[in-house]
Regions:
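Short coil turns that delineate tetratricopeptide repeat
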Residues: 38, 72, 106-109, 143, ...
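Helix-start (N-cap) detector for alpha-helical repeat units in TPR-like alpha-solenoids
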Residues: 7, 41-42, 75-76, 108-112, ...
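Conserved structural position within tetratricopeptide repeats
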Residues: 32-35, 65-69, 103-106, 136-140, ...
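Canonical tetratricopeptide repeat
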Residues: 46, 80, 114-117, 151, ...
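Register position in tetratricopeptide repeats
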Residues: 19, 53, 87, 124, ...
Length: 303
């Protein structure tokens, strides 16, 4: 039996709220829909979507667990559960559920989604070969699946198989040149191999597509590695403007100031870093070295 026009209208309002990233509004609209029409499952799906968009993953998982008791055969709730098992690194549970869901996959889109998350679970369990087999099976059916290319590239990178990683990541750039993560991954891959110019080019591309403090940090440190200290400082300061709590960016900036013999600036950065991570012995050691240099410079200047 189809939904009446009022229900469809309410669902559309929730979907629009989600499209506008108004997750709390979407949540309350879905909550109202569930209260008025408890048998209409799309209201529950949209509530889960709202909770996930708002980063309330624990609450989403609780709702899914509760509702699957009432609708144990509902495949969409099962797929939500699979996604969250992977998110929470419950890889054994994800594999069991995923294999069950895969047996009854009702369409190609559903099959691809389940296969992808089974691959994530295999990777999480330390079975890279199994993950790659699943992902290559997925690519044989869906040769434009960007998630599969990205994940295979990451797995090969993690296992120091750089040529294979590069091949899959470059294939991903052919499919989607504006993919938000592929240029960052290529930048890290080239950095790991000491190919600094290539790394800088890819990281600059990543920053242009989707700026983030972590990508800026990676670019800043790579600029430092080719001797562009001023460029590195500028980029790292920009990363810290975006996120003052990026601890590694703060440490990197202090290190570069130390290399430049700008000991007071180095000490200032590491003091801030220590407030973020008081037990970090490396930061403490760096602070002591910088403080000694500052005191030495002051002693010399007094004489």
């Amino acid at each position: 039996m189809g939904m009446d026009q009022t229900v469809k209208s309410r669902i559309t309002r929730i979907q629009l709220a989600l499209e506008n990233n108004e997750w709390l509004k979407a949540f309350h609209l879905a909550e109202s829909g569930i209260s008025d029409e408890p048998a209409i499952l799309p209201f529950r799906y949209l509530m889960i979507d709202a909770l996930i968009q708002g980063g309330r993953f624990d609450e989403a998982a609780k709702k899914i667990t509760l509702w699957r008791k009432d609708w144990p055969k509902d495949r969409k709730l099962g797929i939500y559960a699979l996604h969250l098992h992977v998110y929470f690194k419950k890889f054994d549970e994800a594999e069991r559920l995923g294999e069950t869901l895969l047996e009854g996959a009702q369409n190609i889109v559903e099959k691809r989604d389940i296969t992808l998350h089974l691959a994530f679970a295999a990777h999480g369990k330390g079975n890279p070969r199994g993950a790659i087999l699943l992902l290559n099976d997925l690519l044989s059916e869906d040769p434009l699946n960007t998630d599969a290319y990205e994940t295979i590239g990451k797995i090969y990178f993690e296992n120091a198989r750089f040529e294979e990683a590069e091949r899959y990541l470059l294939a991903l750039t052919d499919i989607d040149p504006l993919h938000p993560r592929v240029h960052q991954l290529l930048g890290l891959l080239y950095s790991e191999q000491g190919k600094w110019d290539e790394a800088i080019m890819e990281l600059e591309e990543a920053v242009e597509i989707e700026p983030s403090d972590e990508t800026m940090r990676e670019l800043g440190w790579t600029l430092n590695m080719v001797g562009d200290k001023d460029g590195a400082i500028s980029v790292l300061e920009e990363a810290l403007d975006m996120n003052p709590l990026n601890l590694q960016a703060r440490i990197d900036l202090g290190t570069i100031f130390m290399d430049q013999e700008n000991y007071e600036r180095a000490l200032a950065e590491w003091k801030i870093a220590q407030t973020q991570d008081p037990g970090n012995t490396a930061i403490k050691s760096n602070m002591e070295k910088a403080r000694e240099k500052v005191e030495k410079d002051r002693t010399i200047s007094r004489h």
